[in-house]
UniProtKB/Swiss-Prot annotation:
Principal location listed in the UniProt entry: cytoplasm
Protein name: ATP-dependent Clp protease proteolytic subunit 3
InterPro entries, A to Z: ClpP (IPR001907), ClpP/crotonase-like_dom_sf (IPR029045), ClpP/TepA (IPR023562), ClpP_His_AS (IPR033135)
Any GO molecular function: ATPase binding
UniProt keyword list: Cytoplasm, Hydrolase, Protease, Serine protease
Oligomeric and partner information: Fourteen ClpP subunits assemble into 2 heptameric rings which stack back to back to give a disk-like structure with a central cavity, resembling the structure of eukaryotic proteasomes.
Function summary: Cleaves peptides in various proteins in a process that requires ATP hydrolysis. Has a chymotrypsin-like activity. Plays a major role in the degradation of misfolded proteins.
The EC number(s) this enzyme carries: 3.4.21.92
Catalytic residues, chain numbering: 93, 118
Swiss-Prot/TrEMBL catalytic activity: Hydrolysis of proteins to small peptides in the presence of ATP and magnesium. alpha-casein is the usual test substrate. In the absence of ATP, only oligopeptides shorter than five residues are hydrolyzed (such as succinyl-Leu-Tyr-|-NHMec, and Leu-Tyr-Leu-|-Tyr-Trp, in which cleavage of the -Tyr-|-Leu- and -Tyr-|-Trp bonds also occurs)
GO terms for biological process, alphabetical: protein quality control for misfolded or incompletely synthesized proteins
A Pfam match: CLP_protease
The organism's taxonomic lineage, starting at the top: Bacteria, Bacillati, Actinomycetota, Actinomycetes, Mycobacteriales
NCBIfam families, sorted: PRK12553.1
Organism whose genome encodes this protein: Rhodococcus jostii (strain RHA1)
Amino acid sequence: MTTAALPDLNYRDLLADRLFRQRTILLTGEVDDAMAERACSELVLLAAADPKRDIVLYINSPGGSVFAGLAIYDTMKLVPNDVVTVAMGFAASMGQVLLCSGTHGKRISLAHSRIMMHQPSAGIGGTAVDIAIQAESLERMKRQSQEILAAETGHPVEQIAEDSDRDRWFTADEARDYGIVDRVVSSFAEIAPHTTAPRIGL
C-alpha cells in the first residue's frame, strides 16, 4: 500500500494501517470508548483473517474507563488467537489489567517500562440513593478487577485486594516476578517472531 493510494489518510492513519497488516495493535493513551471500538474491531478482523497467527498489543497507557477496558479484555479472550501483550513505557490501572491478560507465556515488558496496579476509582455524586447505587457498582467493578488479576497472576484475590489498595508500582523485573508479565526483553527479535507469517514448504 502506498501513500498515494490512500490520499485521505494522515501519517498516523497510514502507520496504524501498516501495523495492522503486521497483526500489531497499539493501545496508547487513555483507555476510552474510542480506543475500545478500534481495538475490539481490529482484534475481530485479525482473528477472522487468520484465527491461528498471533496478534500483538503494544500498551502504553495510564488506564481509563473500566467499562472500555473490560470490552477490550473480553474481546482478547473471545478471539481464538494467542494475544501477545507488550508493555511499552507505562502500563497503569486498566492498562496493567490488559497487559497481564495476554496469553500466558507471551506477556512481555520492555526493560524500562513501569507498571502500576491499583483499585478502580470513579467520581460519585447525586442523591443519597444515587450515591449508594454508584458505590455498589464501584465495589462490584473493584471485585471484578481483582478476580481478573488473581486469575492472570496466580495470586489469591485477597492478596490482590491488599496489594492494589493503594498505587503499587513495579519495574519490569518486579512485574515479571509478580506474574503480571512473563518476560522482560531488550531485543525486537524476541517479539518479532510473533508477527511473522508461517513459512510453507522448504
